């Protein structure tokens, strides 16, 4: 699914402030990671990254390409490509708990300031 900024803001409201990361920071980071498209798959340095949050198959999910995957989120990577973001959010929070927001490389250079443009006026 191709989300809009406002649709995504609505769905991800529960992440606002989690571990000190604001909703606009998440929206910006997701935009620069996957363009709000749940179907995004990127092959990167021998890993494959899936979905909105670009969660990789080496550490966080399994896809039978990398064996063994640590599969910390205990899930098939394909689950990050559907429209239900519940499992994506649960895994993203685990990543945040463990690695911090800078796990998402777009965050520091692109999403640490001037975040007004990432707010949804309708919320």
Curated annotation (Swiss-Prot):
GO cellular component terms listed in the entry, alphabetical order: extracellular region
Keyword Calcium: yes
Keyword Transit peptide set for record: no
Binding site for Ca(2+): 79, 82, 84, 87-88
CDD domains: LYZ_LA
Tissue spec. comment: Mammary gland specific. Secreted in milk.
Record note on quaternary structure: Lactose synthase (LS) is a heterodimer of a catalytic component, beta1,4-galactosyltransferase (beta4Gal-T1) and a regulatory component, alpha-lactalbumin (LA).
Protein name from the UniProt record: Alpha-lactalbumin
Source organism (scientific name): Equus asinus
């Amino acid at each position: 699914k191709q989300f809009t900024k406002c649709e995504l803001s609505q769905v991800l409201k529960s992440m606002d402030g989690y571990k000190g990361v604001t909703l606009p920071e998440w929206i910006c980071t997701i935009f620069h990671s996957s363009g709000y498209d749940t179907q995004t798959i990127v092959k990167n340095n021998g890993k494959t990254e899936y979905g909105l949050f670009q969660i990789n198959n080496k550490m966080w999910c399994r896809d039978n390409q990398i064996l063994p995957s640590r599969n910390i989120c205990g899930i098939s990577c394909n689950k990050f490509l559907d429209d239900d973001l519940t499992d994506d959010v649960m895994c993203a929070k685990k990543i945040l708990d463990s690695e911090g927001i800078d796990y998402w490389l777009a965050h520091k250079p692109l999403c640490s300031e001037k975040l007004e443009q990432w707010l949804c006026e309708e919320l």
